[in-house]
Amino acid sequence: MSPTSFFLLTLLLVLVTEARGARERFSQSAEDPSSSHMGIKIRAGGSGSGSAMEEYSVSENSWSNFKSKHPSSISSESFHEESSSSSEMSSSGGHFGLKMRGSQAGGGMSSFKTRVKSRILK
């Protein structure tokens, strides 16, 4: 067995094992409504300053509840949500804001690049 195929099989095994573990934790919490806190936090891969979505945890019950408790840390996220929803709703000649820009570039990766750029800019 070549080292490349061994590495790929090991990587596949790790990914399948991690996915199964996450699914089991999720199904246990769905079956047991008394466990409202699973200890899950959303974290970004970078070492920069944390955004509001990174600080949000399941214990907050809802995103709107978190926004009401931490209004200063979510100013950029709420602005981005409002601007993207308003640009999608306003149409001029069949063009829909950000979605049209991604489709004009052509190719399937353009929307992915737009999303990555918007996450980096936050």
From Swiss-Prot:
Q: Name one Pfam family in it.
A: Svs_4_5_6
Q: Which domain of life is it from?
A: Eukaryota
- Which parts of the sequence are annotated with region: Disordered? 23-122
- Per the record, what is one GO cellular component? extracellular region
Disulphides: none
Q: Could you tell me which InterPro entries the record lists for this protein? A: Svs4/5/6
Question: Under what conditions is it induced?
Answer: By testosterone.
Which keywords are on file for this protein?
Secreted, Signal
Give residue spans, biased composition: Polar residues.
27-37
Where, by tissue, is this protein expressed?
Testis.
| Compartments it resides in | Secreted, Extracellular space
Q: Which residues form the signal peptide?
A: 1-21
Family, as annotated: Belongs to the SVP2/SVP5/SVP6 family.
User: What is this protein identified as?
Assistant: Seminal vesicle secretory protein 5
What lineage is on file?
Answer: Eukaryota, Metazoa, Chordata, Craniata, Vertebrata
